Amino acid sequence: MATGKIIQVIGAVVDVEFPQDAVPKVYNALEVEGAAEKLVLEVQQQLGGGVVRCIAMGSSDGLSRGLKVINLEHPIEVPVGKSTLGRIMNVLGDPIDMKGPIGEEERWAIHREAPSYEDLASSQDLLETGIKVMDLICPFAKGGKVGLFGGAGVGKTVNMMELIRNIAIEHSGYSVFAGVGERTREGNDFYHEMTDSNVLDKVSLVYGQMNEPPGNRLRVALTGLTMAEKFRDEGRDVLLFIDNIYRYTLAGTEVSALLGRMPSAVGYQPTLAEEMGVLQERITSTKTGSITSVQAVYVPADDLTDPSPATTFAHLDATVVLSRQIASLGIYPAVDPLDSTSRQLDPLVVGQEHYDVARGVQSILQRYQELKDIIAILGMDELSEDDKLVVSRARKIQRFLSQPFFVAEVFTGSPGKFVSLKDTIRGFKGIMNGDYDHLPEQAFYMVGTIEEAVEKAKKL
């Protein structure tokens, strides 16, 4: 193995000089000898004269010029397979949960080619989440990609935790969770939530938190994806959760700036679309198995036209948009039923009844939205009888779209509910048809099935 020496350190960027005939390839991993903790560098550029520019995967504090660096002659490799289940790992696949070493079956490089066109497969099967608003308005496809879009504090992580809990228990498959640049506290909560729900032994957790250097946050999504690809290639249906794709983009922006590239729109890296494509094109289903991915996407300043969320939109099958306005009404999950969409919401896929109910719910809510201005200026009394009925049903539908979560029982004080798709469609169809016009709207708030709303109305 060739060895070189550090000639320059600027924050997370480290320049290493190698002999002219042994220059490492781009994306090769290098290990620093003599660093206080294990430190791996990834080659990003060859500058000529035997010098390579690298990004550090850990803190570069304490590095000095002249330190010896070994070329490992392969990209970063991480353990894959069943031994990773129930464990928390970092970007290098090293365990960080104090439970001893991972019994490695094999290691795969994190940089891999996307499957070829001939190997790809698509599925029309629906993945039932047990969350009414998602199953009704933006159904998830097995092997599809779902984005949870929302600004700060509207519930992306809580929604994701609920999805993992529901799908892991009801779906009994394996899941991989990649925490990309999120809070360490959330990672901790997440771990304990998985333990309490008894699903930890079905989940591999890979964390690269907010306090990590940008190189680490840029690569941790690929580490999680590589583990998911292994399960897929064994013929399984695996779930990949990424929280948060925006931090992946942001890490790319930081790395790009550190490497001296010219920024593009809003200061993002010029390679934004390509970097997003490299990740997203690998998250796909083949003839052997499927990867269904759920990705949280932070929306800066609630602006969906920002280049980062806008680039992500293009890759998704379903988009779940979380709205601050709905959250402010106390309706959780704060999904905007008029802004959320799914490619699966087609009568040929979900059936005519589901399609009609979903579109009916949307049209009633849309009409209510239009009438809000009139109500604000003139009051309810000025509306026609038909419009009064629309408003009354819309407010019931709005409340019935809320639901108590298992992972939020501590906050809501009510037990979580898993609602089957059949019950969801039946409930909304009943409200639209006027079967429950006599019930007060409070009865529909934070309940599971329509029967629970009827029971709640008796107590009011």
Swiss-Prot record:
Membrane topology of the entry: Peripheral membrane protein
Keywords tagged on the record: ATP synthesis, ATP-binding, Cell inner membrane, Cell membrane, CF(1), Hydrogen ion transport, Ion transport, Membrane, Nucleotide-binding, Translocase, Transport
Residues engaged in binding ATP: G150, G151, A152, G153, V154, G155, K156, T157
EC id: 7.1.2.2
Residues forming coiled coils: none
Catalytic activity, reaction form: ATP + H2O + 4 H(+)(in) = ADP + phosphate + 5 H(+)(out)
Disulphide bridges: none
Gene3D superfamilies: 2.40.10.170, Bovine Mitochondrial F1-atpase, Atp Synthase Beta Chain, Chain D, domain 3 (1.10.1140.10), P-loop containing nucleotide triphosphate hydrolases (3.40.50.300)
GO molecular function, one term: ATP binding
The keyword Transport belongs to this UniProt entry's keyword annotation: yes
Location(s) in or outside the cell: Cell inner membrane
InterPro entries in UniProt: AAA+_ATPase, ATP-synt_VA_C, ATP_synth_F1_bsu, ATPase_a/bsu_AS, ATPase_alpha/beta_chains, ATPase_F1/V1/A1_a/bsu_N, ATPase_F1/V1/A1_a/bsu_N_sf, ATPase_F1/V1/A1_a/bsu_nucl-bd
SMART domains reported in the protein's UniProt record: AAA
Complex and partners: F-type ATPases have 2 components, CF(1) - the catalytic core - and CF(0) - the membrane proton channel. CF(1) has five subunits: alpha(3), beta(3), gamma(1), delta(1), epsilon(1). CF(0) has three main subunits: a(1), b(2) and c(9-12). The alpha and beta chains form an alternating ring which encloses part of the gamma chain. CF(1) is attached to CF(0) by a central stalk formed by the gamma and epsilon chains, while a peripheral stalk is formed by the delta and b chains.
Free-text function comment from the UniProt entry: Produces ATP from ADP in the presence of a proton gradient across the membrane. The catalytic sites are hosted primarily by the beta subunits.
Family: Belongs to the ATPase alpha/beta chains family.
Name listed for the protein in its UniProt record: ATP synthase subunit beta
Highest classification ranks of the organism: Bacteria, Pseudomonadati, Pseudomonadota, Gammaproteobacteria, Enterobacterales
Gene: atpD
